[in-house]
Amino acid sequence: MRFCFFFCFTASIFCTTGNSSDIVFCCAHTPCLLHLEVDQETSVTWIDSNTGQIPLCLSNGTCHISEKGLHFSANFSKDGLYIAIINETNYHAAEHYYLVYIYENCHQMPYDSPRHTGHKGTSFNWSMGLWLVKCSHNKTFFLPFVLDSAKSAPIIMTETAITIYISMIFLIVSLLTFLNVLITLNNKYKHYGV
């Protein structure tokens, strides 16, 4: 049995320690998209990091490439790291996507967001905020996210969002610690009748 919290934690560690920039969570047995829009003059090559070759799913028909990115069919549900090699005039880059599938009580919703245009037409439809992920056994977790506007609406966790999330946790813990110190001092002064 898989729990999305386990995946979120594992993928978060991978994202902050590895080379990945985006972590995409998708519901199993539903279509999924690694979203990367580029202009017609831009060349994009997708690579499976496990093999260093083009993804095997392209040859067996469980995924395909379009101007929107790398699409996975509902029949595909294998976690893995995929790299998009972007080649433009005087510009070369690599976008890393770690794909994680959630199997139980996973809910995806369509979402539309403003377009953010990157270098020379490379664009990403992203919107940052907090996303409520419902897991098995009625567990819920608020996670930092960047939502793709595709109908499959995968949850994408970026390094920036993870940093914000960790900062929020640190701030909350600091406030609780400060509050605890105030309560302790208050009780101490009451004990001595000050």
Swiss-Prot record:
Write the signal peptide boundaries: none
Q: List the disulfide bonds.
A: none
Q: Does the keyword Glycoprotein apply?
A: yes
**Has keyword Glycoprotein?**
yes
The protein's recorded glycosylation sites are 19, 60, 75, 87, 125, 138
Keyword line: Early protein, Glycoprotein
- Please report the name of this protein according to its UniProt entry: Early E3 22.1 kDa glycoprotein
Supply the source organism for this entry.
Answer: Canine adenovirus serotype 1 (strain RI261) (CAdV-1)
Q: What is the lineage of its organism?
A: Viruses, Varidnaviria, Bamfordvirae, Preplasmiviricota, Tectiliviricetes
